[in-house]
């Protein structure tokens, strides 16, 4: 199964999952041969892409080759970012924007779909939990949010740079606190919180974009005033900092830590749904949750009742999409199920 943009669909392809309009209307059932009329209909209903059947063995082989290239590039990029950080911290030299973001943008551009991006990052982040890897992930995810928001290339590059440098202040936090394998004490958390101010102070020594400095300072601020270091509310938080905040929280929650496993993406979405409206930029958070959930359409998941299913449709309750059970192809609308939800993406 693979995702194909509607403008790249060809007659004769076969749908892998049911195709729904953005409003939930069934347009074409799965296992149907796509006609020219169907393609025109998809365009009429503003359907951007559909999932079509393909050779699973061939797809797996192609993805494995692609992933191997991305994995090697990712590792090299982390090494390069480490050198850039050393330049900034110890040599008082900061690379130009294009040099800094080159690796991040190149990795981003290798992904054809958002599912590929999240699937690859989910695997890569399990092998590297360093601040450098987190910064690379935030840069990539934040750029995707910018693309979804329709921002121009100049603004996307600003976002990529802000993501890479947002946590630079952590290098001034003692390792025994930063890497502590357990819950921080109140006093230790107060020390951790200082990394935002430290980051701004470090970057303020250089002639770089103000948005990069502000993202380092404000990426833990929340729209309702519950964040730090200043307890700012919406009117004092710029868009780039708000985007970095969402990407930062998502990557942190889905990443493995020494004291816990990474959370299932749909559990993270549920957490965002619970208090996201008040804490995060309303322009980006709803779009982000819908797009992330939609990225997993066609994916196989494990439900909390132990059964395996395939996601076929995202409802207004993004954390609880509609699925078909693999055992009998019956449809289960998770938003109507109180005791069943997605436990893991397989």
Regions found by a protein language model. Give the residues of each.
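Membrane-cytosol interface segments
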Residues: 1-99, 328-333, 338-340
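A residue-level detector for short acidic-glycine micro-motifs
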Residues: 33-35, 167, 313-315
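Divalent-cation-assisted or electrostatically stabilized phosphate/pyrophosphate-binding catalytic cores
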Residues: 42, 180-198, 222-325
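Acidic/His-rich, divalent-metal-binding segments that scaffold phosphate/diphosphate chemistry
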Residues: 58-190, 203-206, 211
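Short acidic/histidine-centered micro-motifs embedded in hydrophobic/aromatic stretches
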Residues: 103, 124, 159-162, 195, ...
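Short catalytic-site patches enriched in acidic/histidine residues
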Residues: 168, 173, 216-231
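C-terminal accessory subdomain/extension
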Residues: 314-346
């Amino acid at each position: 199964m693979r995702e194909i943009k509607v403008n790249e669909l060809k007659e004769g392809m076969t749908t892998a999952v049911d195709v729904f309009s953005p409003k939930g209307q069934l347009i074409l059932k799965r296992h149907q041969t796509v006609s020219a009329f169907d393609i025109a209909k998809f365009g009429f209903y503003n359907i951007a892409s559909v999932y079509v059947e393909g050779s699973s063995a061939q797809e797996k082989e192609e993805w494995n080759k692609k992933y191997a290239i991305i994995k090697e590039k990712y590792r090299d990029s982390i090494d390069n970012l480490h050198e850039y950080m050393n330049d900034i911290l110890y040599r008082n030299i900061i690379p130009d924007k294009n040099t800094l973001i080159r690796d991040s943008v190149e990795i981003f551009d290798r992904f054809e779909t958002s599912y590929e991006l999240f699937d690859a990052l989910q695997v890569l982040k399990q092998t590297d939990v360093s601040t450098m890897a987190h910064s690379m992930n935030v840069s990539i995810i934040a750029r995707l949010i910018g693309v979804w928001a329709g921002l121009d290339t100049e603004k996307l590059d600003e976002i990529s740079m802000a993501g890479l440098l947002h946590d630079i202040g952590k290098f001034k936090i003692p390792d025994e606190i930063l890497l502590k394998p357990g819950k921080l004490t109140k006093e230790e958390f107060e020390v951790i919180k200082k990394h935002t101010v430290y980051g701004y102070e470090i970057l303020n020594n250089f002639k770089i974009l103000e948005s990069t400095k502000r993202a380092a300072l404000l990426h833990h601020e929340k729209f309702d005033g519950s964040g730090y270091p200043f307890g700012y509310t919406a009117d004092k938080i710029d868009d780039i900092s708000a985007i970095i905040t969402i990407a930062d929280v998502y990557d942190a929650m889905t990443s493995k830590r020494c004291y816990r496993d990474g959370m299932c993406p749909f559990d993270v979405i549920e957490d965002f749904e619970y208090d996201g409206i008040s804490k995060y930029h309303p322009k980006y958070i709803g779009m982000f949750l819908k797009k992330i959930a939609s990225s997993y359409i066609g994916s196989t998941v494990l439900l909390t009742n132990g059964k395996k299913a395939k996601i076929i449709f995202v409802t207004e309750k993004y954390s609880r999409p509609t699925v078909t059970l693999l055992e009998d192809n019956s449809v289960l609308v998770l938003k109507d199920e109180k005791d069943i939800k997605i436990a893991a993406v397989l």
